[in-house]
From Swiss-Prot:
One of its GO terms (cellular component) is cytoplasm. Belongs to the sugar phosphate cyclases superfamily. Dehydroquinate synthase family. This is 3-dehydroquinate synthase. InterPro entries: Dehydroquinate_synthase, DHQ_synth_AroB, DHQ_synth_fam, DHQS/DOIS_N, DHQS_C. Pfam families: DHQ_synthase, DHQS_C. It is found in: Cytoplasm. HAMAP family: DHQ_synthase. GO terms for molecular function: 3-dehydroquinate synthase activity; metal ion binding; nucleotide binding. Pathway: Metabolic intermediate biosynthesis; chorismate biosynthesis; chorismate from D-erythrose 4-phosphate and phosphoenolpyruvate: step 2/7. Catalyzes the conversion of 3-deoxy-D-arabino-heptulosonate 7-phosphate (DAHP) to dehydroquinate (DHQ). Signal peptide: none annotated.
Length: 362
């Protein structure tokens, strides 16, 4: 078992990483006997896990209700938030209840945002079941839903009471979704940690076999990197946390342009990181050799390195102008300057960005 703590002034919460955590009531901290909870999950996971989780929690003395939502990014919406609120009110959940997010990034975002809003804020627990959520989305307190004009446009900073990462949940994850999570792990290597990037190169085959030791190291290293950044820049105020968005401005534009249907988030991030690297190369900040190295690792992770559904580059650029990091009508992009290093660049010529999008999509 690996455990770390995120400390934010007087607030702190644990992240626990191991196999078999869902089998033990003590794993579900800070729940205790007599508590009331509402588990939020989706139609894919409910048949696999709902009954066993209910048994563990009810044997521990928790009064548990649940809501099952449709599965998919297109359901990360205000309509789904309304469904959660309605269920909480119908089942008489007050300010001392606990929401439990059991799912991937969509469920985590929905549950966290609902917790931030319901009766002006209630406790919630993150139990991420996808690799993407385990290495990234469940940590740091960013919660949001999408709008038709942009991804993650409506949300709040709201930290969970704990994060419970059971590696066994990955056994049911389809390969495409598993690879989507690997994109976020690779992002940490490109943006922050050259040694971790090298480790990913050396251990990609073990990760794809879902070797428990390799997964444990990968997840814990990603959590360590993100935890450190969140503790230094919780609300994205000094620019450090923004570096976690390497490739994401491009990726969110791809997802918005394709209506969240054709690309998983990690697939869009994979393409977006290459767009960022191409932009950096055009600015003389990044080598072609390193772009080739990144492409090779992404391909080994079964990730796309170019568009596989028709995308209009000019529309992508327009969507990018809606990004939350835009200031004074100027794009602010996270650009790699070497493998393991990244910086924020403002005011990059739109023609350079557009050319990078076109080249990567070809």
């Amino acid at each position: 078992m690996k455990k770390m703590t995120i400390t934010l002034g007087p607030r702190n919460y644990p992240i626990t990483i191991s196999s078999g955590l869902l089998n033990h009531f003590d794993s579900f901290e800070p729940l205790k006997k007599g508590d009331q909870g509402m588990l939020v999950t989706n139609q894919t996971l409910a048949p696999l896990y709902l009954s066993s989780i209910r048994t563990v929690l009810e044997q521990g003395g928790v009064r548990l209700d649940h809501i099952i939502l449709p599965d998919g990014e297109k359901y990360k919406s205000l309509a789904s938030i309304e469904l959660i609120f309605t269920e909480l009110l119908k089942k008489w959940h007050g300010r001392h209840t606990t929401l439990i997010a059991f799912g991937g990034g969509v469920i985590g975002d929905l549950t966290g945002f609902a917790a931030a809003c319901y009766q002006r804020g209630i406790r919630y627990i993150q139990i991420p079941t996808t690799l993407l959520a385990q290495v990234d989305a469940s940590i740091g307190g960013k919660t949001a839903v999408n709008h038709q004009l942009g991804k993650n446009m409506i949300g709040a900073f709201y930290q969970p009471a704990s994060v419970i990462i059971d590696i066994d949940c990955l056994s049911h994850l389809p390969l495409r979704h598993f690879s989507s999570g690997l994109a976020e792990a690779i992002k940490y290597g490109i943006a922050f940690d050259f040694d971790f990037f090298c480790w990913l190169e050396a251990n990609m085959d073990s990760l794809l076999r879902r070797d428990v030791d390799a997964l444990s190291h990968c997840i814990s290293r990603c959590c360590q990197i993100k935890s450190k950044i969140v503790m230094e820049d919780e609300r994205d105020e000094n620019g450090l946390r923004a570096l976690l968005n390497l490739g994401h401005t491009y990726a969110h534009a791809i997802e918005t342009e394709t209506n969240y249907i054709f690309y998983l988030h990690g697939e869009a991030v994979s393409i977006g990181m290459l767009m960022a690297a191409q932009t950096a190369q055009k600015l003389g900040l990044f080598s072609k050799t390193d772009i080739i190295r990144i492409k090779k690792l992404l391909l080994r992770a079964k990730l796309p390195i170019q568009g596989f559904h028709q995308i209009d580059p000019k529309s992508c650029l327009l969507h990018m102008m809606h990004d939350k990091k835009v200031m004074n009508d100027k794009l602010r992009l996270i650009i790699p300057t070497a493998i393991g290093q990244s910086e924020i660049y403002e005011g990059i010529d739109n023609d350079i960005v557009l050319a990078s999008i076109k080249e990567t999509l070809m």
